[in-house]
Amino acid sequence: LLYSIIEVREEEKRKLLAETCDQQYWILKAPLIVVFVADHRRWCDLYRAAGCTPRKPGLGDAWLAMSDANIAAQNMVIAAESFGLGSGYIGDIIEQHERVKEALCLPDEVFPACMLVIGHPSEQQKQRKKPARFHRDYIVHTEVYHTMEPQVHQHFFEERALRNETPVVDFPAQVEAFWKRKYESVFSREMNRSARAYLAAFAEETEEEKR
């Protein structure tokens, strides 16, 4: 058990999370807001309670804990759906390290993996057509990872667009627009800065590793 769940109920704290998560104030309407955190503090405290002297958690420990937290979050999504509830992942919880860490009182061995908002979907949302995803051949590799040629990327990009009834008019321009909106955006840079701050506590070399 390498994760914990923080249910956020206080209105002011909800507002802060909505603000730090890219000003997504619709979050405030959700009946349930939960933050899944990768948690090594619990085990370190448990070890100490038993008289052990735990080593400092490393990047591998952080990676494993983050996987645990995300798996638990997806299980909550599936469970919620079985009750007719809708959910949404808020990846922006990784941003604004200082403010989120203070608001949730996170020790150094604990950091957010994701945030979920859960509520009752409207009829319009229930009837909304799901967008087509990329073809499985673009996602699933056999035996080893296969690096694809530019024309292969374009083929699968255009193939998905056709199934979504939004034909690609200018492939380079559309990809560039997405690149600017997501990969090169202000929030993306802030997310990476914040992630480095969270993981700094796990990235320090131990004396054993230095040897």
Give a label for each model feature.
Residues L1-R211:
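Acidic, surface-exposed loops and disordered segments
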